């Protein structure tokens, strides 16, 4: 490297530093996120209801108290505050509804039924459905978006 042009070494150093920071951040998130993520597998067996699924998550501070979105059918979507998993997949949002329950905001259409609950996870429909069925759950599995899949129980 030329003494008159220190730029190549500087760019290389900045790149290495950025790469190291990114790897450390990913490693810290990966290790702490996976190790400390709360599993919702047992609750997604479809033997519960919207209130019994969502209320403990609210009480523990695992999800935000106000829904980020309410569907016309009254299904409420709650953001997570802490890492959650379902059948080994990271939870993107928690879903829930229970008729006449103040936890849930009503939508502007016909409610989905008396209750519904579930999650949207990061994963393909095929992989998620295989894990759900292997665990013995009767939950409905539907693709929400590419690589986002809903796991839902309802009455």
Report residues per predicted region.
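Short helix/turn-capping signatures at newly exposed starts of structured segments
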Residues: 34-97, 110
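C-terminal partner/receptor-binding element of secreted or periplasmic proteins
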Residues: 129-155
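C-terminal segment of classical bacterial N-terminal signal peptides
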Residues: 25-34
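Short, ordered beta-strand-loop transition motifs
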Residues: 68-74, 108-114, 140-148
């Amino acid at each position: 490297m030329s003494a008159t042009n220190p730029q190549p070494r500087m760019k290389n150093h900045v790149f290495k530093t950025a790469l190291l920071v990114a790897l450390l951040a990913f490693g810290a998130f990966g290790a702490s996120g996976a190790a400390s993520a709360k599993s919702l597998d047992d609750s997604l067996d479809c033997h519960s209801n919207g209130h019994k699924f969502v209320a403990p998550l609210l009480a523990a501070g695992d999800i935000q108290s106000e829904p980020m979105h309410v569907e016309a059918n009254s299904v409420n979507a709650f953001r997570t505050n802490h890492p959650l998993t379902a059948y080994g997949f990271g939870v993107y949002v928690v879903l829930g509804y229970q008729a006449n329950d103040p936890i849930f905001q009503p939508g502007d259409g016909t409610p989905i039924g008396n209750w519904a609950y579930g999650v949207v996870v990061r994963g393909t429909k095929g992989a998620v459905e295989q894990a759900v069925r292997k665990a013995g759950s009767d939950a409905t599995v539907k693709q929400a978006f590419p690589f986002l899949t809903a796991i839902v129980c309802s009455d």
